[in-house]
């Protein structure tokens, strides 16, 4: 009798994978709804574009690799990759950007490594970082939330801007980005970093319309709370574990609090970090990716804490306003090392 020894993972339950991915997609509904409310229909258009391009890219690669297309697409992982990238980019970014990002994410960051379960890096964040480095202007051209916006594009206008760069009336991104103060708006994190470097005091910065929210940036605080609600539902459904989100948020809050106490004139307050940018999206939907995150409980705590520290460092001292994507990828690099030193000890093993 011949016994075959295969490398892990030893089981692969496609039905279970499909169910978890579907739960994550459902949990994203509150966050998507909040982004639609505050930033307009462009988010929905980007999600549709990303979904189609990820499915087509995955199907093409599977066909070339002579693997079952229908069976693999049913695991919903391609849809989730497209969704995460679509909600991470500005809602009126040119159509070709989300297509390029999703195709790169699926073909290079996922299928090139062997497909789902083999990729060491989060595919959606690879796609996002490629776009951010290649097209920094377009990737940082966020619209002001509707509560401080002058021009709010409708569904048809959003489609026209995404595909042609202009609305039917001739408006462009520069016009649509104007806030109630007549100044082009950026995200709370981007505004803070730019203003501090320009020599503005924190007291002055907090008077800007973008910070008119109750807790943090206008619109962004509610978007983050919506992603938090979806994340808590995932925990309740046991689709994700608590270790990574908790250690990530606690570390980010702790670093932000200490930094703010020591340098309140140059560093953002903790609520700005927690309720702006992609904080809650990253904590519950990106870092918890079971393929690219640590697989032990202690490892998950270390992994989340490392990502939280990196996000704060990049936001506070780096060249980019939001460091979630870079933090995720840098933390992904450390996963083999973390798992090696945190794996459970074999029963009966003694220290040498």
Curated annotation (Swiss-Prot):
Keywords: Cell inner membrane, Cell membrane, Electron transport, Flavoprotein, FMN, Membrane, Phosphoprotein, Translocase, Transmembrane, Transmembrane helix, Transport. GO terms for cellular component: plasma membrane. Its EC number is 7.-.-.-. It comes from the Bacteria. It holds the Pfam family NQR2_RnfD_RnfE. Its cofactor is FMN. It is a multi-pass membrane protein. Its main location: membrane. The chain crosses the membrane at residues 20-40, 42-62, 89-109, 123-143, 214-234, 242-262, 267-287, 301-321, 322-342. The modification FMN phosphoryl threonine is found at residue 187. It is found in: Cell inner membrane. One of its GO terms (biological process) is transmembrane transport. Belongs to the NqrB/RnfD family. Part of a membrane-bound complex that couples electron transfer with translocation of ions across the membrane. Required to maintain the reduced state of SoxR. The complex is composed of six subunits: RsxA, RsxB, RsxC, RsxD, RsxE and RsxG. This is Ion-translocating oxidoreductase complex subunit D. It comes from Shigella sonnei (strain Ss046).
């Amino acid at each position: 009798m011949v016994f075959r020894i295969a490398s892990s993972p030893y089981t692969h339950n496609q039905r279970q994978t499909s169910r978890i991915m579907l739960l994550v997609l459902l949990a994203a509904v509150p966050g998507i709804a909040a982004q639609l409310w505050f930033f307009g229909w462009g988010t929905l258009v980007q999600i549709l574009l990303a979904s189609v391009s990820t499915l087509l890219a995955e199907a093409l690669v599977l066909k070339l690799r002579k693997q079952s297309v229908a069976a693999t697409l049913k695991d919903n992982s391609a849809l989730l990759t497209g969704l995460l990238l679509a909600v991470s980019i500005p809602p009126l970014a040119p159509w070709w950007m989300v297509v390029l990002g999703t195709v790169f994410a699926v073909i290079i960051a996922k299928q090139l490594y062997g497909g789902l379960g083999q990729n060491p890096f989060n595919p959606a964040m690879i796609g996002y970082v490629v776009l951010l480095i290649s097209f920094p202007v377009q990737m940082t051209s966020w619209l002001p939330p509707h509560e401080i916006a002058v021009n709010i594009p409708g569904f048809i206008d959003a489609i026209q801007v995404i595909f042609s760069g202009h609305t039917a009336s001739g408006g462009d991104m520069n016009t649509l980005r104007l806030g109630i103060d007549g100044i082009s708006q950026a995200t709370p994190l981007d505004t803070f970093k730019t203003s501090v470097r320009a020599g503005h005091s924190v007291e002055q910065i907090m008077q800007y319309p973008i910070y008119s929210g109750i807790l943090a940036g206008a619109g962004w605080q509610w978007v983050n709370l919506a992603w938090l609600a979806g994340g808590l539902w995932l925990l309740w459904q046991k689709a994700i574990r608590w270790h990574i989100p908790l250690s990530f948020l606690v570390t980010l809050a702790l670093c932000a609090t200490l930094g703010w106490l020591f340098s309140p004139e140059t560093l953002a307050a903790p609520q700005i970090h927690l309720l702006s940018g992609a904080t809650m999206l990253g904590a519950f939907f990106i870092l918890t990716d079971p393929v690219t995150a640590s697989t032990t409980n202690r490892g998950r705590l270390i992994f989340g804490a490392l990502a939280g520290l990196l996000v704060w460092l990049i936001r506070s001292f780096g060249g980019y306003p939001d460091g979630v994507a870079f933090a995720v990828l840098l933390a992904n690099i450390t996963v083999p090392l973390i798992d090696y030193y945190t794996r459970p000890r074999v029963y009966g093993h003694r220290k040498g």
